[in-house]
C-alpha cells in the first residue's frame, strides 16, 4: 500500500472519526440484550462516469480498513465493499456511525478515482463483466455456484440483534417470518438491472434467490432441529459451515444474534436506521412473547412467501395477502407499530420506528430512483447521480411525492 495514503489517513482524521473511534473503543465489550449492529454493502463506481468498478486494488481496501478502524472489507465481487458498525444500544449512535463509515469509505475510494453507491443493484452494471475477489474462500464459492455466483452483483443490508437465549432465538425467527416482507418493501432499492427497468421495486432478491439456501427460513421449532439440518449439509460436503445458510433471516454462527438479511441496502442512512430499529423493537416483542411462534405454521409461511414476492414487485405500494383479504403496507405497518411501540420506547428508538411510516407513505429508494428516471426522460445517468448524492448526503432527501409505479 502507498505509504503516502497511510500517512494522510493518520494525519487527516475528521472530527467525526476521532469522536467515533473513541466512543466505539469499548462498544464490542458493553453488550446488552437487544443491542444491535448493521452491515451494509456498497458498489464501487468510477467517480466520473459512475460505471461500476470491475477490478479494484487491494490497497483501496487496506486504506478503507485503516480509515474506519477495521470496519471495511472486501466482498465476494471486486465491485463491492462492505462496512460493519460497532455494537450499539442507541439508534442515534448507529446513525452517526453509518454516516461516518460511508463518508470515510467514499473519501478513501476517491483517492483511487472511485466513489460508493448505496443501492442493491447498480442500474447499469452488466453481471457478465463481474470479477470475483481473488481469495481462496471466494474461489471455492465461485467453483460451486458458477454462473449463479457471477450473477450475484448485488448489495444488501444485514441487521444483527442480540437475543441471548438460543431456543428463544429460534422462536423469534419462526414468529418473524410473516413480517419479513414488510422489511423488503421498506428497503427496496433495486428497480434496475443490466441497464433495464425491471418492473420490480426490489429486484435484488429475485436474482439472489437463484442461490441455494435462500428465501424465507424453514419452520424449525428448536435449535436441535436446525443443528440436525446444518449437520446433514456439512457432513455431506454441501457447505463448510452454517454461514453458507443464506436465508432472509438466520441465527448467527459467531454471535448470540438473529440476523435479518432480507433488506436491500437503503440509500438513505436515516431509512437504514429506521428499518433496523423496527426490526430491533419487533425482535424484543417476539422474544418476550415466545408463544407467538406457535401461530406461525405452514399456511402462514406460504402466505409470507407470496407477500415476499409482492413486496419485491410493488415495494411500498404493495397490497399484502391476509386471510381476511388484501391489506395495504401502511395498514400492516400500523399494526406492527401498535404492537411494538412499548418496546421501541423501552429501547429509545420510537422516533426511528415512526420514520417507517414516512417511508411507507412516500416511498423507498426505488421510488426516488424511478422518479429520477422519469423526470430525466429515461436517463440512467440521472438515477446514478441521485444515488451518489443520497448515499453520502448529510441531510435526508426530500419526501415530496407519492411512490412511483414501475413499468408494467
UniProtKB/Swiss-Prot annotation:
Documented EC number(s): 6.3.2.2
Keywords from the UniProt entry: ATP-binding, Ligase, Nucleotide-binding
Gene3D superfamilies xrefs: 3.30.590.20
Keyword ATP-binding: yes
Record-level Gene Ontology MF annotations: ATP binding; glutamate-cysteine ligase activity
BP-aspect Gene Ontology terms: modified amino acid biosynthetic process
Pfam families found in the cross-reference section: GCS2 (PF04107)
Record-linked InterPro entries: GCL_type2/YbdK_subfam, GCS2, Gln_synth/guanido_kin_cat_dom, YbdK
Chemical reaction(s) catalysed: L-cysteine + L-glutamate + ATP = gamma-L-glutamyl-L-cysteine + ADP + phosphate + H(+)
UniProt key word Membrane: no
Family according to the record: Belongs to the glutamate--cysteine ligase type 2 family. YbdK subfamily.
UniProt cross-references to PANTHER family, sorted A to Z: GLUTAMATE--CYSTEINE LIGASE 2-RELATED
Protein name: Putative glutamate--cysteine ligase 2
Provenance organism: Bradyrhizobium sp. (strain BTAi1 / ATCC BAA-1182)
